[in-house]
């Protein structure tokens, strides 16, 4: 049986660590002037894939 191909869009969006899958943060790309500084601070930092989606993301990444 051949190897499963990685979903290339998922490979560009997610990074796999030891036990968690890191993802980018939404709401940080444009129209930033109207968003409060507190919200922008809270959007900084690492974000991880929710536990309910981990198996689907792993399947896309071939992990």
From Swiss-Prot:
Biological process according to GO: translation
InterPro entries the record matches: Ribosomal_bL35, Ribosomal_bL35-like, Ribosomal_bL35_CS, Ribosomal_bL35_sf
Keyword Zinc assigned: no
The keyword Disulfide bond belongs to this UniProt entry's keyword annotation: no
GO molecular function: structural constituent of ribosome
One GO cellular component, as annotated: cytosolic large ribosomal subunit
Pfam families, per the entry: Ribosomal_L35p
Keywords for this protein: Ribonucleoprotein, Ribosomal protein
Sequence similarity: Belongs to the bacterial ribosomal protein bL35 family.
NCBIfam families listed in its UniProt record: rpmI_bact (TIGR00001)
PANTHER family per UniProt: 54S RIBOSOMAL PROTEIN BL35M, LARGE RIBOSOMAL SUBUNIT PROTEIN BL35M
Name this protein carries in UniProt: Large ribosomal subunit protein bL35
Native organism: Campylobacter curvus (strain 525.92)
């Amino acid at each position: 049986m051949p190897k499963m191909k990685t979903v290339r869009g998922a490979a560009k969006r997610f990074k796999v660590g030891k036990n968690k899958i890191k993802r980018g943060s939404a709401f940080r790309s444009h129209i930033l002037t109207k968003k409060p500084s507190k919200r922008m601070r809270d959007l900084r930092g690492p974000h991880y894939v929710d536990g309910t989606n981990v198996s689907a993301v792993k399947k896309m990444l071939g992990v």
